[in-house]
């Protein structure tokens, strides 16, 4: 009673095809496949090959964001909490 038979799943599939159509389902499938591929590529090892330079986006802060060096230059009496961890 808790599990569905093959006939239940076929009826659900038939209703989904009738509602969305085969073209829309194909587009959804290709979009989902592209998203999964992008996710897998993103989850691969973050190291870059030796011949490829590292990305410079991490070195440049976004406009309007204050870096640690700028913050310490503005107020030398502040303490960097991240630097005071027990090692």
Curated annotation (Swiss-Prot):
Signal peptide coordinates? none
Q: Where in the cell is it found?
A: Cell inner membrane
Q: How does it sit in the membrane?
A: Single-pass membrane protein
Q: Which GO terms describe its biological process?
A: protein transport by the Tat complex
Q: Where is the composition biased (Low complexity)?
A: 46-64
- Keywords tagged on the record: Cell inner membrane, Cell membrane, Membrane, Protein transport, Translocation, Transmembrane, Transmembrane helix, Transport
Give the UniProt entry's GO cellular component terms.
Answer: TAT protein transport complex
**UniProt keyword Transport present:** yes
User: What stretches pass through the bilayer?
Assistant: 1-21
What is a single Pfam family found in this protein's UniProt entry? TatA_B_E
**Region entry Disordered: which residue ranges?**
40-87
Q: Which GO terms describe its molecular function?
A: protein transmembrane transporter activity
Q: Which domain of life is it from?
A: Bacteria
Q: What does this protein do?
A: Part of the twin-arginine translocation (Tat) system that transports large folded proteins containing a characteristic twin-arginine motif in their signal peptide across membranes. TatA could form the protein-conducting channel of the Tat system.
- PANTHER family linked to this entry: SEC-INDEPENDENT PROTEIN TRANSLOCASE PROTEIN TATA
Q: Give the family this protein belongs to, as stated in its UniProt record.
A: Belongs to the TatA/E family.
Query: What is said about its interaction partners and assembly?
Result: The Tat system comprises two distinct complexes: a TatABC complex, containing multiple copies of TatA, TatB and TatC subunits, and a separate TatA complex, containing only TatA subunits. Substrates initially bind to the TatABC complex, which probably triggers association of the separate TatA complex to form the active translocon.
Please give the name of this protein: Sec-independent protein translocase protein TatA
